């Protein structure tokens, strides 16, 4: 049932930390590539809460709701009330997709830009894997180390 609400999921490997240099004390920009879908990602992570190192593998999922039945999120957190998608992951952020761009050529690429309260994500790769996202869509990012 949960797989129906997940819009994107893949296993990533951390390639580099802070590729453009360290900008913030408690935030690290993670550069990672995915195993199955050959996606590229930059993701800002609060590494004081969720530390990552080069070579770490993690599952990353994007979903519009945490409710397993697919109902929209109410915006209120009630601990222990019912099982949610968050129960299967270790690090969760909520944000808004603010930009989608596509580039044509020999190998077309699509890019998603999401802001999680100022922590940013760029997800780049084959347009077929990210064509079902919509501009201004609210998304949950869910991560779990492998």
Swiss-Prot record:
GO CC, any one term: RNA polymerase II, core complex
Signal peptide region: none
GO BP term (any one): DNA-templated transcription
Localization per Swiss-Prot or TrEMBL: Nucleus
Matching InterPro entries: NA-bd_OB-fold (IPR012340), RPABC3 (IPR005570)
Short name of any one Pfam family annotated for the protein: RNA_pol_Rpb8
Domain of life: Eukaryota
Entry keywords, A to Z: Nucleus
Single GO MF annotation: DNA-directed RNA polymerase activity
Record carries keyword Signal: no
Function: DNA-dependent RNA polymerase catalyzes the transcription of DNA into RNA using the four ribonucleoside triphosphates as substrates. Component of RNA polymerase II which synthesizes mRNA precursors and many functional non-coding RNAs. Pol II is the central component of the basal RNA polymerase II transcription machinery. It is composed of mobile elements that move relative to each other. Component of RNA polymerase V which mediates RNA-directed DNA methylation-dependent (RdDM) transcriptional gene silencing (TGS) of endogenous repeated sequences, including transposable elements.
Entry's family note: Belongs to the eukaryotic RPB8 RNA polymerase subunit family.
Complex and partners: Component of the RNA polymerase II and V complexes. Associates with the mediator complex.
Protein name, entry field: DNA-directed RNA polymerases II and V subunit 8A
């Amino acid at each position: 049932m949960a797989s129906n609400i997940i819009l994107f999921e893949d296993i990533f490997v951390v390639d580099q930390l802070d590729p453009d240099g360290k900008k913030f004390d408690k935030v690290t920009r993670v550069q990672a590539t995915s195993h199955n879908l050959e996606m590229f990602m930059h993701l800002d992570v609060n590494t004081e809460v969720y530390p990552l190192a080069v070579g770490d593998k993690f599952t990353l999922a994007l979903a519009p709701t945490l409710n397993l039945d697919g109902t929209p999120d109410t915006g209120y957190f009630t601990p222990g009330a019912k099982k949610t998608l968050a129960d299967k992951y270790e690090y969760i952020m909520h944000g808004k997709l603010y930009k989608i761009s596509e580039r044509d050529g020999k190998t077309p690429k699509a890019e998603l830009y999401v802001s999680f309260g100022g922590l940013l994500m760029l997800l780049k790769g084959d347009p077929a894997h990210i064509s079902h996202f919509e501009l201004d869509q609210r998304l949950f990012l869910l991560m779990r180390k492998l």
